[in-house]
């Protein structure tokens, strides 16, 4: 396996390298024959999934809760990746799932996830979503007063009380479109008190952008106080949800800082420019379960939760998928430009979703040559196989150790979280990349295609 590095063709040095953290276990698989065999068999790009990593990440979050003596539950944010295998593992382990649409809810239930292990989020939920959520005993995050009335109507029709969290508009982000303001929250609590036959207020939640543990802890502390006030009104109010917002650490600090310091428009195809604020923070010193530990430590939150008897609910997506998958494209052709090349692969940037948020997925792709590599280092951007100028998988002129050739493979690392399928589309009637589940237990590697239930 050959990582991006070195000087490049035509005197261009390419963009500063940004290698993903080493992953010896996955590297051993990529160094073997399997990626090329799968490329031949599937006839196009594909995603590799490692569900054992998903389980380990979830267990790490649960371990932090136990370490802090805090009761809680981890819900996987389903929107982060549509693969069926994550639902299978949540169902078997009894972990929760965060859904925000009727299709997501049906899919989770179809895989055996229990209704009481589902939390339903998102704004202005459709009636069919609320109906099934109430019938199945899901926990519903109520985002608005009119939505609360819809929930009450569904509950009375079903003759079953709805389980709800009231979503708070965070004071630190007053312009968010999510949540109930202070006055609306008081109205909602009073309305729920009048409708005890149709609703159980189990607690509160919020939607908070960003990755600052102290900001999340502060918002969580306010929810604990809201629980105490709600109990005085006769509500159950024994849990809060702090959502996701747990960063993933893709690369080390040195490479990340050098990249931000040195990157400039001539490092990108067509002189494309990116402001550092456009990028996801690909290095985070406090990431994943460690970020939860930081949240619990800030403002004495863990102690406040224990003292108040309040459970902590989490809805991580990307953080549960850290190192749980990668994306593989086959090189279809290479052309030379002034000082760099343009590699065209057999898929599109619709399968690497960061590009469609006016940004760039930055961890270096890894070149898997079909034949023994030789030649000089080579800088190239990577384009998709569509007729769109904007279809760039990598605008950046990546430093490859040798000139890619048709039939070689490019592996984009750590793409399971939000990259694989958030914006996938069969544009040009190109097939959607299949997801290949790897079983690496017991020292052998077996694979199967990811499939929905009953397929």
Question: What is each PLM-predicted segment?
Answer:
Residues 45, 136-142, 172-182, 209-217:
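Flexible, glycine/proline-enriched loop segments at strand-loop-helix junctions
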Residues 144-200:
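Conserved anion-binding
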Residues 1-142, 148-162, 196, 232, ...:
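A charged N-terminal "starter" segment
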Residues 209-213, 218-455:
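C-terminal active-site-proximal or functional interface alpha/beta core segments in diverse enzymes
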Residues 80-82, 103, 124-126, 144-148, ...:
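Active-site-proximal loop/turn and secondary-structure-junction residues that shape catalytic pockets
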Residues 196-207, 406-410:
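Internal alpha/beta core interface subdomains
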Residues 54, 79, 101, 133, ...:
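Conserved, mostly hydrophobic/aromatic
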Residues 73-75, 96, 115-119, 139-141, ...:
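Structural preference for beta-strand elements that scaffold enzyme active sites
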């Amino acid at each position: 396996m050959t990582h991006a590095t070195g000087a490049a063709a035509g005197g261009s040095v390419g963009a500063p390298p940004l290698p993903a953290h080493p992953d010896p276990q996955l590297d051993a698989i990529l160094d073997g024959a399997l990626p090329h065999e799968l490329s031949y068999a599937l006839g196009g790009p594909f995603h590799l999934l490692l569900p054992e990593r998903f389980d380990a990440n979830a267990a790490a979050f649960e371990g932090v809760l136990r370490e802090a003596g805090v009761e809680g539950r981890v819900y996987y944010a389903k929107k982060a990746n549509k693969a069926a295998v994550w639902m299978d593992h949540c169902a078997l382990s009894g972990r929760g799932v965060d859904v925000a649409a009727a299709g997501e809810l049906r899919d989770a239930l179809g895989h055996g996830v229990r209704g009481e292990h589902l939390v339903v989020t998102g704004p202005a939920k459709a009636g069919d979503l609320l109906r099934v959520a109430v019938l199945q005993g899901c926990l519903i995050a109520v985002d608005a007063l009119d939505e609360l009335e819809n929930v009450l109507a569904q509950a009375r029709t079903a003759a079953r009380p709805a389980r709800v969290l009231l979503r708070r508009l965070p004071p630190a982000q007053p312009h968010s479109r999510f949540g109930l303001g202070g006055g609306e929250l008081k109205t909602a609590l009073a309305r729920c008190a009048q409708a005890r036959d149709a609703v159980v207020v189990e607690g509160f939640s919020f939607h908070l952008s960003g990755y600052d543990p102290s900001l999340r802890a502060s918002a969580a502390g306010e929810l604990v106080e809201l629980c105490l006030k709600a109990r005085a009104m006769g509500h159950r109010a024994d849990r809060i949800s702090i959502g996701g917002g747990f960063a993933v650490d893709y690369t080390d600090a040195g490479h990340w800082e050098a990249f931000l310091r040195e990157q400039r428009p001539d490092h990108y195809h067509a002189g494309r420019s990116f402001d550092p604020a456009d990028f996801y923070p690909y290095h985070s010193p406090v990431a994943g379960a460690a970020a939860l530990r930081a949240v619990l430590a800030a403002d004495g939150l863990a102690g406040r939760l224990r003292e108040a008897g309040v459970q902590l609910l989490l809805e991580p997506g990307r953080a549960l998928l850290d190192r749980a998958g990668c994306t593989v494209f086959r090189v279809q052709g290479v052309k030379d430009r002034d000082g760099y090349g343009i590699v065209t692969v057999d898929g599109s940037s619709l399968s690497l979703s960061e590009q469609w948020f006016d940004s760039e997925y930055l961890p270096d792709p890894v070149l898997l040559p079909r034949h023994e590599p030789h030649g000089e280092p080579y800088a190239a951007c990577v384009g998709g196989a569509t007729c769109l100028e904007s279809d760039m998988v990598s605008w950046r002129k990546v430093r490859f150790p040798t000139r890619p050739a048709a039939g070689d493979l490019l592996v984009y690392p750590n793409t399971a979280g939000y990259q694989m399928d958030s914006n996938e589309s069969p544009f040009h009637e190109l097939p959607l990349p299949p997801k290949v589940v790897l079983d690496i237990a017991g020292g052998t590697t077996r694979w199967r295609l990811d499939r929905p239930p009953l397929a």
